[in-house]
């Protein structure tokens, strides 16, 4: 059975996810093709469905995993997501040459991760070092600062600090493109540089529990 055609919208990604799940269920002997496994695993990561991603990885036959290195590459991204290693997510995505059926999904995953990181920083901090913020959103410092200025945040070129604007009701949810009411968080004082990324990782864990 041919691999489903890729599309860019979130609706099309959900439709593609359903198609890939059906292809796996209908596959002879319950064993799908490597492209189907690759798309399905990447789509689970895109939708932050880590439970299904883990179960899929466990049931992919070892012979298929060993013969198709892209599957291991996709799962390595999943491991970074599981560890809440935001800089590692971008690095791992960028380190691979993805197939044409997987690349659009990984690009969407990178963009979704970046939006999530922006939302987390806006909730967790009153200020953060620009270099640490850039690592968390996976962008060069100059590009990251330009992006936050376009969002109405502030940046101090002298101290190299980014000053986030707190989210308002209906702000972007940290999970994936969902809008939910958010209460105004209490002010958070600046934290020493070496603790910033660890603090953000802890904040992700708090929000997801």
Curated annotation (Swiss-Prot):
This is COP9 signalosome complex subunit 8. Pfam families: CSN8_PSD8_EIF3K. Component of the CSN complex, composed of COPS1/GPS1, COPS2, COPS3, COPS4, COPS5, COPS6, COPS7 (COPS7A or COPS7B), COPS8 and COPS9. In the complex, it probably interacts directly with COPS3, COPS4 and COPS7 (COPS7A or COPS7B). Residues 8-179 form the PCI domain. The gene is COPS8. The keyword Nucleus applies. Its main location: cytoplasm. InterPro entries: COP9_CSN8, CSN8_PSD8_EIF3K, PCI_dom. The lineage of its organism: Eukaryota, Metazoa, Chordata, Craniata, Vertebrata. PANTHER family: COP9 SIGNALOSOME COMPLEX SUBUNIT 8. GO terms for biological process: COP9 signalosome assembly; negative regulation of cell population proliferation; protein deneddylation. Coiled coil: none annotated. GO terms for cellular component: COP9 signalosome; cytosol; nucleoplasm; perinuclear region of cytoplasm.
